């Protein structure tokens, strides 16, 4: 490891990563070395507001001391034993999760993509064993422009050509419908071989697309009418991001299955969870699904503490309190911008859509960085604004100034 001493500048570190790592990402040119709360710091110790939050993984803020201590304390005792044995941590975590979210059972996995893959299997099995769909005929409805990961099942469910190009053949029997379109959904639900509808309460990777208030009550009603599982992918929208513990709580509905991930560990460890009641979850029998790392003692301890921080520090309430004024303030200050098409969001899951014929969002992200705020674009026209939920009003006001200043720079240089 003597070569580490040769790495001095940000460019050295970037060149090192590009030389020895696969080129499956195109990072913003900043080399981060530490984080605390809403801030991250590069190797030259420049400070930035983090407005990506690792795609909403650090809702609790970077390196939260309580979560970190829970992680260290458990790591000193037992990190993994596999599900071949019971542990003294997993059952505690499972009980905490099911009580908190109001479901009978939880299945612990590691990543959001694994949660989605688990849901595909769970829903298909329920379809065959409970709904009595003919063998190998089960179908799952998803929405256009959804995003649930980059595993083969997830890209099979996707409509993103970049995710699918040269990765076929794909998993069959995913039906695609427009988002926020109950008429199109009902048309597909009439197929008796449909077992599930999997949907994001807000479409994040599509550009933070917020549905109409009537959409999810309509979804719940239609799924019940046609005996189809309503599955909410809350991996990004859940755990306070939109101002509620679950985004579906805004709409007064309870999905049959909930998918969670990202902030389930506060950014300290990969943890995901699938929640459902017994009539759904118990179709899975021993040996039919699992993961070596899923539900390990270290993950269980971290998960419980991350959720306690979310609840005890009232981070959901903070996102709810700050989100709407932040959004309204941005809309008001950017209403005359020549490069902004729309400002939208829910809670602290926000975005600005730019006119990509006038401005390049990559350049906007670079200017944000220069001005002390880092985030990332969604495709070629939208920039996410998703700070940790521990952000204060004063900090958010300062960030609003940075955002407006950055947009004004591009307005003035058209």
UniProtKB/Swiss-Prot annotation:
<dbReference type="GO" id="GO:0055129">
    <property type="term" value="P:L-proline biosynthetic process"/>
</dbReference>
<comment type="pathway">
    <text>Amino-acid biosynthesis; L-proline biosynthesis; L-glutamate 5-semialdehyde from L-ornithine: step 1/1.</text>
</comment>
<protein>
    <recommendedName>
        <fullName>Ornithine aminotransferase</fullName>
        <ecNumber>2.6.1.13</ecNumber>
    </recommendedName>
</protein>
<keyword id="KW-0663">Pyridoxal phosphate</keyword>
<dbReference type="InterPro" id="IPR005814">
    <property type="entry name" value="Aminotrans_3"/>
</dbReference>
<dbReference type="GO" id="GO:0006591">
    <property type="term" value="P:ornithine metabolic process"/>
</dbReference>
<comment type="subunit">
    <text>Homodimer.</text>
</comment>
<keyword id="KW-1015">Disulfide bond</keyword>
<keyword id="KW-0032">Aminotransferase</keyword>
<keyword id="KW-0808">Transferase</keyword>
<comment type="similarity">
    <text>Belongs to the class-III pyridoxal-phosphate-dependent aminotransferase family.</text>
</comment>
<feature type="modified residue" description="N6-(pyridoxal phosphate)lysine">
    <location>
        <position position="262"/>
    </location>
</feature>
<dbReference type="GO" id="GO:0042802">
    <property type="term" value="F:identical protein binding"/>
</dbReference>
<dbReference type="InterPro" id="IPR050103">
    <property type="entry name" value="Class-III_PLP-dep_AT"/>
</dbReference>
<keyword id="KW-0963">Cytoplasm</keyword>
<dbReference type="GO" id="GO:0005737">
    <property type="term" value="C:cytoplasm"/>
</dbReference>
<dbReference type="InterPro" id="IPR049704">
    <property type="entry name" value="Aminotrans_3_PPA_site"/>
</dbReference>
<dbReference type="InterPro" id="IPR015424">
    <property type="entry name" value="PyrdxlP-dep_Trfase"/>
</dbReference>
<dbReference type="InterPro" id="IPR010164">
    <property type="entry name" value="Orn_aminotrans"/>
</dbReference>
<dbReference type="Pfam" id="PF00202">
    <property type="entry name" value="Aminotran_3"/>
</dbReference>
<dbReference type="GO" id="GO:0030170">
    <property type="term" value="F:pyridoxal phosphate binding"/>
</dbReference>
<dbReference type="GO" id="GO:0004587">
    <property type="term" value="F:ornithine aminotransferase activity"/>
</dbReference>
<comment type="function">
    <text>The enzyme has a very narrow substrate specificity and can only catalyze the transamination of alpha-ketoglutarate with ornithine or N-acetylornithine and, to a lesser extent, of glutamate-5-semialdehyde with glutamate and alanine.</text>
</comment>
<dbReference type="InterPro" id="IPR015422">
    <property type="entry name" value="PyrdxlP-dep_Trfase_small"/>
</dbReference>
<dbReference type="GO" id="GO:0019544">
    <property type="term" value="P:arginine catabolic process to glutamate"/>
</dbReference>
<dbReference type="GO" id="GO:0010121">
    <property type="term" value="P:arginine catabolic process to proline via ornithine"/>
</dbReference>
<dbReference type="InterPro" id="IPR015421">
    <property type="entry name" value="PyrdxlP-dep_Trfase_major"/>
</dbReference>
<feature type="disulfide bond" description="Reversible">
    <location>
        <begin position="154"/>
        <end position="163"/>
    </location>
</feature>
